[in-house]
């Protein structure tokens, strides 16, 4: 049998020695590549050790392999592809495919779909304001900041969130600073809500109540996917991913509004903040010892409920941490699909306005 194998190989013009030489070459190449990968893994573990593993990752090796699969460079490449201009004659076919595939409501899109020059423009499209009414104007109520699935919500009772769904993060690490002390320990509590925007959703995010902010923090990090399964692979995922945090105040007390990057593009934009650049090349990530970029404005930035705050180029997550009265109640269920402007909780009965809708920049 073996002689027949050699005979067939030699008939094709290859001697047994050249056959084995070729396979030896492939083997050496594979061993070299694996050696480099394991060397980088070892060095990566060293870096985390030097910087005391600020995110308390359970396994640095698991984080390394996840970076290999979902690295920032891959997201930047995707971003460039998404920004390639599509010929006008092809746009209807391309966008209608995604509308059908992702089950996007075409009637809500503000502008004709052929006006979007690229996939990036299409996925960050605007919707008609009149399709998203504000559901509650009570001063201690909160509405959804985005079209999303509300993944989790509740009261913060410590500086570390660890829930049954596997979502874990250190509040201090996540915010890049200590939380400010409550206005009144006896009458208020801190609450949180986590929103996930899938690729099919409207990608702009809005103010969930009237608030003002003076501090913007940009914490560089990874752009790992933020779907539910990733929380089982990487603990403290939100402490690792890149994020932008607005720190300010509202009627109920202090508020932290966080926009978190995710895989495929990783870009976050904040309205009227031209200095903000996310997912930059050759950036030392904050959890590996890089600096946190903090911008303190001369004056407060005031936002009314429903005002546009910013946008993602592809879906990601929003986390709102806010102080409110102790008798605050939620009006939603975990994993519920909600629209921007829809009431998710409050102190009093909803105060539904007439003809009050979200606002966009255009």
From Swiss-Prot:
Cell division in keyword set: no
Residues annotated as transmembrane: 26-44
Entry cofactors: pyruvate
Site, Cleavage (non-hydrolytic): residue positions: 315-316
Modification after translation: Is synthesized initially as an inactive proenzyme. Formation of the active enzyme involves a self-maturation process in which the active site pyruvoyl group is generated from an internal serine residue via an autocatalytic post-translational modification. Two non-identical subunits are generated from the proenzyme in this reaction, and the pyruvate is formed at the N-terminus of the alpha chain, which is derived from the carboxyl end of the proenzyme.
Keyword set includes Lipid metabolism: yes
Protein name: Phosphatidylserine decarboxylase proenzyme
Membrane topology listed for this record: Single-pass membrane protein
The protein's enzyme class: lyase
Example of a GO MF term: phosphatidylserine decarboxylase activity
